A protein has these predicted regions:
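Catalytic Walker B motif of ABC-type/P-loop ATPase nucleotide-binding domains
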Residues: 163-166
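Conserved ABC ATPase signature
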Residues: 138-142, 146
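Helix-to-loop junction immediately C-terminal to a conserved catalytic motif
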Residues: 51
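Conserved ABC ATPase "signature" region
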Residues: 115-133
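Conserved catalytic motifs of ABC-family nucleotide-binding domains
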Residues: 159
Length: 259
């Protein structure tokens, strides 16, 4: 089976500063992969490169088996329909209400009638556990957690195969964060999504990721399950994965798996 994302010998430089050097990574269909690393390690840069938003200095990226950055507009449009990205702060259109935000990509297609768009929007709202009455609220009237859910509903409106999440629980209190993680986990199972996320939150990482890629020293320092990563003897990994908070998050994950 063709991997969803293939990154081969990727290097990234901004001015004189190298962010990545000779980085390679494969993400298979249906898995949940987390990218973690310190500030400036290039996590979000890599996430954006995976879908063609940023051009690497060297190397190649293939998405669903197709090379990116070819300049082929038709290919880019076709690939663009197969993935969606949830940005850290939702990126909702402030002058649109919730319904209009979710309907926007559907209307852009120009081939779906308004009755069907209405039904699809209401379905996606239900999928992210929001009510029909929420459709008529403006973004300024939404809580942080609701903004995340509306942005997720908009992403799901195009029936993507690949979902990319940039700090999906940033700014949420623990209860709302846990609820959002459960929602993503449920949608991953129901829809067979491939999910790639950037996070620094240990509870999110433990609650979602099947595999983790640790970015440090301009490369992928370690790749594997959380249990495998924790066996790697490196200062960043010890500090990130072996602190008291990490142990509590992992213990919570183990308790959930037993239920």
């Amino acid at each position: 089976m063709t991997p969803v994302i293939e990154v081969e010998h990727l290097s990234t430089r901004f001015g004189e500063h190298w962010v990545h050097r000779d980085l390679s990574l494969v993400i298979e269909k249906g898995e949940v992969m987390a990218l973690v690393g310190g500030s400036g390690s290039g996590k979000t840069t890599l996430l954006r490169q995976m879908i063609g938003l940023l051009h690497p200095t060297q190397g190649q990226i293939r998405l669903f088996g197709e090379p990116l950055f070819t300049g082929n507009a038709a290919q880019e449009r076709n690939l663009g329909r197969r993935f969606r990205m949830l940005f850290q702060y939702g990126a909702l259109y402030s002058s649109f209400n919730v319904f209009q935000n979710i309907a926007f990509p559907l209307r852009e297609l120009g081939v779906i009638d308004e009755d069907l768009i209405h039904n699809l929007v209401m379905l996606k709202l239900s999928m992210v556990e929001l009510l029909p009455r929420h459709a008529w609220l403006m973004p300024s009237e939404l809580s942080g957690g609701m903004i995340k859910r509306v942005a997720l509903a908009r992403a799901l409106s195009m029936e993507p195969e690949l979902l990319l999440l940039d700090e999906p629980t940033a700014g949420l209190d623990p209860d709302r964060s846990e609820s959002f993680v459960r929602l993503i986990r449920s949608l991953h199972r129901q829809l067979g999504l491939t999910v790639v996320l950037v996070t620094h939150d240990l509870d999110t990482l433990a609650g979602l990721a099947a595999r983790v890629a640790v970015l440090a020293e301009q490369r992928i320092l370690a790749l594997g399950t959380i249990d495998e990563i924790m066996k790697v003897d490196h200062p960043f990994i010890r500090n990130f994965f072996c602190c008291d908070r990490a142990q509590r998050a992992l213990q919570s994950r183990m308790s959930e798996e037993k239920v």
